[in-house]
Amino acid sequence: MMNLGSLSLSTSKSSKPMVSISFWIPYFTHWGESLLVCGSAPGLGSGNVKKGLLLKPSQQDDQLIWSGSVSVPPGFSSDYCYYVVDDSKSVLRSEFGMKRKLVVPETLTGGESVHLRDLWQSGDQALPFRSAFKDVIFHHSFDVKVEKPLGVFMNKSDQDDSVVVQFKICCPDIGEGTSVYVLGTPEKLGNWKVENGLRLNYVDDSIWEADCLIPKADFPIKYRYCKVQKEDSIGFESGGNRELSLHSIGSKQEYIVMSDGLFRAMPWRGAGVAVPMFSVRSEDDVGVGEFLDLKLLVDWAVDSGLHLVQLLPVNDTSVHKMWWDSYPYSSLSVFALHPLYLRVQALSERLPEDIKEEIQKAKNQLDKNDVDYEATMETKLSIAKKIFDIEKDQTLNSSTFQKFFSENEGWLKPYAAFCFLRDFFETSDHSQWGTFSDYTDDKLEKLISKDNLHYNTICFHYYIQYHLHVQLSAAAEYARKKGVVLKGDLPIGVDRNSVDTWVYRNLFRMNTSTGAPPDYFDKNGQNWGFPTYNWEEMSKDNYAWWRARLTQMGKYFTAYRIDHILGFFRIWELPAHAMTGLVGKFRPSIPLSQEELEKEGIWDFDRLSKPYIQKKFLEEKFGDFWPFIASNFLNETQKDMYEFKEDCNTEKKIVAKLKSLAEKSLLLENEDKVRRDVFDILRNVVLIKDPEDARKFYPRFNIEDTSSFQDLDDHSKNVLKRLYYDYYFQRQEDLWRKNALKTLPALLNSSNMLACGEDLGLIPSCVHPVMQELGLVGLRIQRMPSESDVKFGIPSNYDYMTVCAPSCHDCSTLRAWWEEDEERRQQYFKEVIGVDGIPPSQCIPEITHFILRQHVEAPSMWAIFPLQDMMALKEEYTTRPATEETINDPTNPKHYWRYRVHVTLDSLLKDTDLKSTIKNLVSSSGRSVPANVSGEDINKSRGEVIANGSTKPNP
């Protein structure tokens, strides 16, 4: 039987003296949960949590302490981590951040006792080690020279009346020439005087530590960490004093290791700019923003006091070979980059004059108000092909290309083959590719063989991806050196006709479609057309596809936005034949069972789950036109009651029928209006029957809006209303929480990028606690408050673990929003700005300045503004109609994503007034600003860190 809380590596035959290692950590658990420590060495489970050391709980003052011990030989070393487990030792939660390191010095002779006093590492405490901070913003703190090995004790516990205490603190943001001290009540800690305090040594990964011999009589002790700069300025950590008491110290030689987590300071805050890659304009680009334009954008960001540049997805979307592909969230490949962003003149240093002239001509022709997607793609690929024909042998035989190919061939070869087959069959629908519809590795190798006549075409796709990689890598490295975080975007889905669904068909539910229920963006819901993920299948290889996807993204970006993070809790799943997003169901979810409904007196399931169509409804909706609708779409089942005909009983069939009627000139009414009205009749249901189990049902969203519901008796209405609210707002919470805690860590552990979640829309109550637990940064848009009882968000009330913004790419810009609604404008002017009277009809620079100042002064970690909203600070940039600056219209599934900034980055870089205005806004709010090219200090408030377990800045 296991001895709870203790473990020994010694055997009965061994007489070697052992060192006792005791673990001690405060952590509040729920009923049925325990804490366990697992490490890489055999004594701590060899990485197998089931074999780890189970800790035992005890109440000490107001803390629940978990402790246990293990006996190890001197020289023992191991990584270790704490886990929350259930009774069967299955992991419920684990710590975040880097693994802890345990090193038992060889200088110990055995018989000593080492007490590890740890603190749980939560998700937000791991943020300083994400690449956005470690490699970009705080990179100077990780370049400090190591002064001593980790874990070595500089003092020996050879006095019975004293204890060696090793103090250990993480300082992710440390200035040049700055030292870290611990000061406190005992004499060895200087009696609070820095000149007599204990100076810590840097031991790597922003960890500072030192030890001293403290008399037992001095305990309990109080202490705090501080930073001391060359000029003797002292910066104490915020918060109260730390305390250390001796609880169970015996007569052995005692060592205590105090791992005190993060240096407590005012939370670090920064600002950034958001703009789609295609929207950027420069003097060098051809028709669209290009990866190399990011260098100019980074320079502008640095000059404007901004630490971050945020882009929309940049993966290849070339599914249809037309402007529909301008939609950046419908990936042809989640690994390949989009040829749209290629700078063709950078493909070679020896371009022939005729190609140079062709590029210049293309620049002039494509320098339009908006992106001409089709012309730009055609032109760039045509020019790139001519350069490829000249450069291919030299490029494909180069060591840099060979290295790129060997590191990326797992996705690059299927991508090139897919592009060839797409063009050969003139469709991306791989179900139409005959023998190639079913992917196999053997078929792939034959397709890309050097012996094929089309091998040159395959190599062209390799060539394009190689140069896109080179150009984006150069821009990414430039941003890192400038102290600017490059933030990418992770789409929630992939296109149904994509490389990924071709190669990994088992990972997708191809008979379904992904969307979102009705919300701020669209009252009818959204249908994005992506197949939903088969999470059960993905889990079998520990989410290898996701891990590869995030690893690839991490080559270029140091932060990323998780599009529709709610999809990792539950997704709004629609049948593949649906075109709108209203009649869906959540997956996973607990449906209403037939037995459950029958117990409530609900029996007529056909009545509730089939479209409820009465003659009077047809007359109300279509007027005199109703007989035409009835004769073409419906069958009469009984007097004045109808059902849909077999050839038009889905949304896709209805669209096909309407198209046929229009072609025959039989449709006299507006086709779009008729389609919407017929869709309304089709969706006039109360319950949606599960397509895989006829005894399970889902309440239709906005159930009370349907005439089918309104025509029910009061008893049925009351029952169904109660079950509706239970389904959507109560019964799923625990299921969705557990689902997110399985899927999201797979993403977070796949790369070192800083993860931000887009948590807008219909938010289950489990979402924000899980995001906080995982250290995910949320999103707050002022016009879309997460609180249901307010119309406008209050930035000063936002949590620290958020990005705040006045608008985003899925809604109108600040200027357009201001002009859209007079009543709302008046309300905002009075309630938020605090001014009575009539507001200006346009969002003048003074109003823009007020709104941006509101946001930079918010507690949020990041304030990220669309470039259009920043340009609205200056009147000369507001001459373009505000409505033309909108990037996306979520209500239009065929929106053309083509917005281009009407001013070049070259011009913006010369505009010192705008840059100065933005930089002053940022710096005056206490947010960090990057160092300029002359190397001035990054900011005045040196020593800021990520909030230590806090959701708001300390006062």
Curated annotation (Swiss-Prot):
Ways its activity is controlled:
Inactivated in response to cold stress.
- SS bond list: none
Going by the record, the broad EC class of this enzyme is: transferase
> Where can this protein be found?
Cytoplasm, Cytosol
* Phenotypic effect of disruption: Dwarf plants with yellowish leaves that accumulate large amounts of maltose. Increased tolerance to cold.
Q: For this UniProt record, give its keywords in alphabetical order, as a comma-separated list.
A: Acetylation, Carbohydrate metabolism, Cytoplasm, Glycosyltransferase, Repeat, Transferase
Q: Coiled coil: which residue ranges?
A: none
What Gene3D superfamilies has UniProt attached to this entry? Glycosidases, Immunoglobulins
Q: What's one GO MF term for it?
A: starch binding
Every copy of the CBM20 domain together lies at 13-122, 157-270
Enzyme Commission no: 2.4.1.25
Q: Which parts of this chain are annotated as the region Disordered?
A: 925-955
| One Pfam entry name | Glyco_hydro_77
Enumerate the Gene Ontology biological process terms.
Answer: maltose catabolic process; maltose metabolic process; polysaccharide metabolic process; starch catabolic process
Q: According to its UniProt record, which reaction does this protein catalyse?
A: Transfers a segment of a (1->4)-alpha-D-glucan to a new position in an acceptor, which may be glucose or a (1->4)-alpha-D-glucan
Q: What is this protein called?
A: 4-alpha-glucanotransferase DPE2
Query: Which species is this record about?
Result: Arabidopsis thaliana (Mouse-ear cress)
Recite the lineage of the species. Eukaryota, Viridiplantae, Streptophyta, Embryophyta, Tracheophyta
Gene name linked to the record: DPE2
